[in-house]
Amino acid sequence: MSSEAELNPTTYIQHHLTNHTISVGDGAFWVLHTDTLFMSVLLGVVSLGLIWMVVRKATSGVPSKTQAFVELLIEFIDDQVKTTFHGNRHAFVAPAALTIFVWVLLLNAMDFLPIDIMAWIYEHIFGLHNWRSVPTADVNTTFALALSIWILTIYFAIKVKGFGGWVTELVCTPFGKNPLLWPFNLLLNVIEYISKPLSHSLRLFGNMYAGEIIFMLLGMWAATGVTGTFFGAILGAGWAIFHILIVVLQAFIFMMLAVVYLSMAHESH
């Protein structure tokens, strides 16, 4: 913040909720959130790098603590996929589930960075007045992830059932093959297809955005002397401990919904 005199709830929250953006073209219709893009790509590379490093150092003998943890994580995710997806899960779905979980977990975990310290670093070291560290608190990120999974479900549905079989399923389920019922079947299936990426993305976004707001409120109370620095730190630490559950749980739910949608794409009614 530029001045302590300007510090009030409105300016404090607006400052921390403003993305670093660049406009594409002459107009302002297409605006890129460069902080979201940078952090998403960076953490994607980090997640792949971590997995690659563990795999490269894996041994058949007594595993290291890191290798043992990763093996437990892979086994846990594989068991979750196995209960939902009944095809050849190792060809795509299980590796995709592992990638989604690790990536989204790292994206969510950025919420643990102290917002005021990070804001000071971004502004005074990198010259960035506005920069948001939590990509999943930006609906553009969660919708892009959900939309990618949605496209994959359509791709696999057509691949497994054929284009004709997929269209037939759209117009003939759930009420049957009577031509009089085709419009109702199609309407219900279109609504279902549209609602999947919306609910998938907004669930993750809503939880992470709310968590970020609470961290901001706690930081604002401490900065303005409402709770005091010490008591504010205690409140922040308490919420951070509880937020660990939210961060992990939301990554798990997002991954499992992706597996469920991919499983549905491989099944016939």
Curated annotation (Swiss-Prot):
One of its GO terms (biological process) is proton motive force-driven plasma membrane ATP synthesis. PROSITE patterns: ATPASE_A (PS00449). Keywords: ATP synthesis, Cell inner membrane, Cell membrane, CF(0), Hydrogen ion transport, Ion transport, Membrane, Transmembrane, Transmembrane helix, Transport. It is found in: Cell inner membrane. The keyword Zinc does not apply. One of its GO terms (molecular function) is proton-transporting ATP synthase activity, rotational mechanism. The chain crosses the membrane at residues 35-55, 92-112, 143-163, 213-233, 240-260. The keyword Cell membrane applies. Gene3D superfamilies: ATP synthase, F0 complex, subunit A (1.20.120.220). SUPFAM superfamilies: F1F0 ATP synthase subunit A (SSF81336). Pfam families: ATP-synt_A (PF00119). InterPro entries: ATP_syn_F0_a_bact/chloroplast, ATP_synth_F0_asu, ATP_synth_F0_asu_AS, F0_ATP_A_sf. One of its GO terms (cellular component) is plasma membrane. It is a multi-pass membrane protein. It comes from the Bacteria. F-type ATPases have 2 components, CF(1) - the catalytic core - and CF(0) - the membrane proton channel. CF(1) has five subunits: alpha(3), beta(3), gamma(1), delta(1), epsilon(1). CF(0) has three main subunits: a(1), b(2) and c(9-12). The alpha and beta chains form an alternating ring which encloses part of the gamma chain. CF(1) is attached to CF(0) by a central stalk formed by the gamma and epsilon chains, while a peripheral stalk is formed by the delta and b chains. Belongs to the ATPase A chain family. Key component of the proton channel; it plays a direct role in the translocation of protons across the membrane. This is ATP synthase subunit a. It comes from Nitrosomonas europaea (strain ATCC 19718 / CIP 103999 / KCTC 2705 / NBRC 14298).
